[in-house]
Amino acid sequence: MAKYTNDELLEAFGEMTLVELSEFVKAFEEKFDVEAAAPVAAVAAVAGAAAPAEEEKDEFDVILSAVGDKKIQVIKAVRAITNLGLAEAKALVDGAPKAVLEKAKKEDAEKAKAQLEEAGASVELK
């Protein structure tokens, strides 16, 4: 029995019509008692189950998008939120866009966003 390489098989399949390929798949399924559609259905079921979990997000990243013209107030707000020192808070603000908080609870993230926006910064939650 001759052994064919993947390239040789792909070349042979490439020369077949869709009808011929469909017949081949049916014959393959019968001979080896497998079903070609089963893995696709399982993947679709897993993907469908994962979607609702994504909607119920409970951890957020607070991203400082832009500082605005009140840089000192934004640095003070960053220090209050993160307990960073002055130099670290200034470096964070100067490096915008940057994460101020990561994996924060929704309540804490919204509170931090409000504080930063009140100080004059542009903020987004991800």
Swiss-Prot record:
Cross-referenced Gene3D superfamilies: 3.30.1390.10, Single helix bin
The entry's cellular-component GO terms read: cytosolic large ribosomal subunit
What keywords sit in the KW lines? Ribonucleoprotein, Ribosomal protein
Gene Ontology molecular function? mRNA binding; structural constituent of ribosome
* GO biological processes: translation
Keyword check for Nucleus: no
Among InterPro entries, the record links this protein to: Ribosomal_bL12, Ribosomal_bL12_C, Ribosomal_bL12_C/ClpS-like, Ribosomal_bL12_oligo, Ribosomal_bL12_oligo_N_sf
Task: Tell me any Pfam family this protein matches.
Answer: Ribosomal_L12
Family listed: Belongs to the bacterial ribosomal protein bL12 family.
According to its UniProt entry, the function of this protein is described as:
Forms part of the ribosomal stalk which helps the ribosome interact with GTP-bound translation factors. Is thus essential for accurate translation.
Q: How does it assemble?
A: Homodimer. Part of the ribosomal stalk of the 50S ribosomal subunit. Forms a multimeric L10(L12)X complex, where L10 forms an elongated spine to which 2 to 4 L12 dimers bind in a sequential fashion. Binds GTP-bound translation factors.
What name does the UniProt record give this protein? Large ribosomal subunit protein bL12
Q: Which organism is it from?
A: Bifidobacterium longum (strain NCC 2705)
